Amino acid sequence: MGTFKIYPGKLKGEVKIPPSKSMAHRGVICAALGDGISKIRNINYSDDIRATINAMRSLGAIITKEDEYLHIIGIKSEKCKKNIELNRTIDCNESGSTLRFLVPISCIFEGSSRFIGKGNLGKRPLDTYYEIFDNQGIKYSYKKGKLDLRIQGILKYGEFKLRGDISSQFISGMLFTLPLLEGDSKIIITTELESKGYIDLTLSAMSDFGIEIINNNYREFIIKGNQTYKSIDYRIEGDYSQAAFFLVADALKSEVFINDLKLESLQGDKEVIEILERMNMKIKNIDNSLLGIPRENLEATIIDGSQCPDIIPVISLAASLCNGRTEIINVGRLRIKECDRLSAVASELNKLGANIIEKEDSLIIDGVKTLKGGVKVWSHKDHRIAMMLAIASTVCMEPIILEDYECISKSYPEFFDDFKALGGNFHEWNLGE
């Protein structure tokens, strides 16, 4: 267990935002499903991305890390056709994306697949896939409370009815898979679709790799079978979910110029800009760098988090220091992330002096003038909680003690290097101090 003592103090300088984890998952998968050689550039080797890379290796792709790019020989190439393991084990580590994207993909190959992982991954629901398996006669078994899923059987093309309010990852997983089947398929969305931005990223990546899908207003998707993922040179853009931490730091009167973001991005987490602007912050594009310029006071607002769940922890920090009451609604899905993020946000920020009431599907946040600090807080072993608390420390009255900070390696291993380069003041802390 790693523990940091982090001191108050504003951040100042420039930061290059790491490449988008969401886009990297998609780029690696599309390239690995291809029939030739692809190069993925500007990729960050976080724990989650390593899990997806290793998963695609288990399915037969030959993937090599070069100095400037990730070199991928696709599964459909002649070189890889005999490379797939018939009885394969796919270790997803703690990556929900790896698990939910790869489960249906694994069902296009002969043999059996065993999915394992750690942390809270075994608690994330997979009922959507179990229903498909039951309908198609695919054999599977699992253990409750831990990830140990075994699957044997071939997925067949057809019509699939999926809920849109559980996780968009199920829809993306099926979208990746169905173009490779022999016949045509249709996905029908039976509820309101949450996290549309993630579906847009999936469709965009697949289009870049030559796959055609008809999107009928997110109510249904028409997928032609027998398609081929082409091999391309693919560059990953900067990650808005990570930029959100430094934009909120700017909202709290730091001065961080944020580089390497695509302004016309499809990322759903780009909504952080619109949310902060509603909170009375001005965001400027200065020589292709974003800088948040806070006005005198941040103002409360109502935030629908259904389309941007990953930025809700750090947005909750900003809301804690707004004038008035902020309501963050439609965020019940945050309870089944790396931890129960609604509970973690409320409990840890309240320790610092915030005033947050946790509801089943929402957070009610009454703004306070200052955060006191001077206490021990816990990341809940969740990367986004850890980084949010580090940003919170910059405006506390007293230092904080952050336990289990290493979980940042899941998405942003260099976070504390960047935090330090911007003037963040922290050191390892031992219980004896």
Swiss-Prot record:
Keywords assigned by UniProt, alphabetized: Amino-acid biosynthesis, Aromatic amino acid biosynthesis, Cytoplasm, Transferase
- Entry keyword annotation includes Cytoplasm: yes
The catalytic activity of this protein is classed by the Enzyme Commission as: 2.5.1.19
GO biological process terms on file = amino acid biosynthetic process; aromatic amino acid family biosynthetic process; chorismate biosynthetic process
User: Which InterPro entries does this UniProt record tie to the protein?
Assistant: Enolpyruvate_Tfrase_dom (IPR001986), Enolpyruvate_Tfrase_sf (IPR036968), EPSP_synthase (IPR006264), EPSP_synthase_CS (IPR023193), RNA3'P_cycl/enolpyr_Trfase_a/b (IPR013792)
Q: In which pathway does it act?
A: Metabolic intermediate biosynthesis; chorismate biosynthesis; chorismate from D-erythrose 4-phosphate and phosphoenolpyruvate: step 6/7
The UniProt GO MF terms for this protein read: 3-phosphoshikimate 1-carboxyvinyltransferase activity
Q: Superkingdom, according to UniProt? A: Bacteria
The similarity annotation says:
Belongs to the EPSP synthase family.
Q: What is this protein called?
A: 3-phosphoshikimate 1-carboxyvinyltransferase
Q: Which organism is it from?
A: Clostridium botulinum (strain Alaska E43 / Type E3)
